[in-house]
Amino acid sequence: MAKEIVKELLPLIRVYKDGSVERLLSSENVAASPEDPQTGVSSKDIVIADNPYVSARIFLPKSHHTNNKLPIFLYFHGGAFCVESAFSFFVHRYLNILASEANIIAISVDFRLLPHHPIPAAYEDGWTTLKWIASHANNTNTTNPEPWLLNHADFTKVYVGGETSGANIAHNLLLRAGNESLPGDLKILGGLLCCPFFWGSKPIGSEAVEGHEQSLAMKVWNFACPDAPGGIDNPWINPCVPGAPSLATLACSKLLVTITGKDEFRDRDILYHHTVEQSGWQGELQLFDAGDEEHAFQLFKPETHLAKAMIKRLASFLV
């Protein structure tokens, strides 16, 4: 007898009456590696916190054998808050490449996913991880210190970023850090938002007027945070809505927003960039158009000319 479906968000996820979940678009998980054969990057899995449980995969480039301290990049994967993981094939391959190209320590957070953990669970897991990083900067971590951070990290160069829904998480962490101090007063140097997932009730730019309320972006947010005050115009998903917290408080000294030609969030992300620019935010603001591609293409097709160019652009920012 077929299991009864109680909810589905196609083409992403299917939820059954018995509580089981089928994640339709997730790539397979792969193991961490002492040395990636293509890049020489080392990776391992670590526990950030026990209650609630948060884990991550940390990446260390081959150059760590020198005495130079390395920037830290706290990364949040995409997947509409409901598919993929810190350990999935595409994320693992991408961060091996980026860690090697940029010469950074990357930390990929395995935040809690829908449907059992609606937003803001992913935001909270991100904040927990930021505090965990900060605990290494001032040597207050006595429970689960990470030697790769203690021995190789430059805590004056902390970056926070991600793809699509992961970039949404990063944005919300940057806002929170602007209003709530991290342990030891750790500062975030940069934010890297690749095709961030933002949306709103009123179509803008090239967004289709007809069917806007039935768009996948709308359905994802209603699935992710069904009780959000304001619904799709909650500032978590629509940071440009009137009455949203000022983007002038973003807690980083420089911010890079990337867009692509075929991404449905393109106009939202250009508006976000403009809103930051007009907010009075005092940092260095950058916008990069990666070309005529879908969002997150550099994860799926890293060997292409445009992907290589984008990864080089990201690496030049993470310094």
Swiss-Prot record:
The active site is at T164, D263, H295. Pfam families: Abhydrolase_3. InterPro entries: AB_hydrolase_3 (IPR013094), AB_hydrolase_fold (IPR029058), Carboxylest/Gibb_receptor (IPR050466), Lipase_GDXG_HIS_AS (IPR002168). Pathway: Secondary metabolite biosynthesis; flavonoid biosynthesis. Changing G79A: Reduction of both dehydratase and carboxylesterase activities. It catalyses: (2R,3S)-2,4',7-trihydroxyisoflavanone = daidzein + H2O + H(+); 2-hydroxy-2,3-dihydrogenistein = genistein + H2O + H(+); a carboxylic ester + H2O = an alcohol + a carboxylate + H(+). GO terms for biological process: flavonoid biosynthetic process; isoflavonoid biosynthetic process; isoflavonoid metabolic process. A motif (Involved in the stabilization of the negatively charged intermediate by the formation of the oxyanion hole) lies at residues 77-79. It comes from the Eukaryota. SUPFAM superfamilies: alpha/beta-Hydrolases. Keywords: Flavonoid biosynthesis, Hydrolase, Lyase. Changing T164 to A/S: Reduction of both dehydratase and carboxylesterase activities. Belongs to the 'GDXG' lipolytic enzyme family. Dehydratase that mediates the biosynthesis of isoflavonoids. Can use both 4'-hydroxylated and 4'-methoxylated 2-hydroxyisoflavanones as substrates. Also has a slight carboxylesterase activity toward p-nitrophenyl butyrate. This is 2-hydroxyisoflavanone dehydratase. The gene is HIDH.
